[in-house]
Amino acid sequence: MAIRLSTAPLAAAVANEGGIGLIAASGMGLDELRKDIRMARELTGGKGIIGINAMVAARQFLDLITTAAEEGIDLIVAGAGFSRDIFAVGRRYGVEVVPIVSSARLAQTAEKLGASAVVVEGTEAGGHLGTQQSIKEILPEVIEAVNIPVIAAGGAIDGNDVAELLKLGANGVQMGSRFAASEESNAAPALKE
C-alpha cells in the first residue's frame, strides 16, 4: 500500500490476524523504518509475519531493504521496477524476497534468481503497474510458468473476490487499497470516509 499508509499499527494488526503485515517503506527515512519495524514487532509480541513493501524506483531502495533486513524483517516485497540486488540482500540476511511481477516471463526470472514467491498484479491493482492484463488473465499464466507460490493482487475488495482468486489457483491474495480505510491505517480521516 502507498507511502505512509501502511505503517506499524496496520502491519501488526494484519499479522496478529494471521496475515502477512507489510510496512510501506518507500518514503521513510532509515531511522523511521527501524522504529516502525520495532514497533510492529512489539505490537505482535514478536509473533506473526512482518515484512516491508519497497518501490525499486525509490531513491533509497537498497538502503531501505538493507536496513529492514538488518532489523530482522521476515520478507521484502518489491515493486515499481525489478531489482536483482534484492536477492543478494535476501541471501545475505536470510530474508525472503517476493518481487511484484506483471508477466510470466518476469516471474520465471524472479524464480531463477531465488524468489520465495511472487506477487502478480493485474491492471486492477492500485500501484506498481506493468501490464494491461487483468489479474484473472495473467494469474493462470504465471501459475503455469513457475514452481513457487503465486500471490494475486489487484481488485480484491471482499471475501468473494479473494475466493475467486484462490479458485483460479493463487496461493494467497494481497490486499492494499481495501485497508486504507481501516482504523489502523495512517490515511487521512477524509480518505477513510
Regions found by a protein language model. Name each.
Residues 1-149:
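Active-site entrance/lid segments in N-terminal catalytic domains of soluble metabolic enzymes
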Residues 10, 125, 132-151, 157-193:
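Conserved active-site-proximal phosphate/metal-binding subdomains
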Residues 1, 155-156:
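Active-site metal-binding loops of divalent metal-dependent hydrolases
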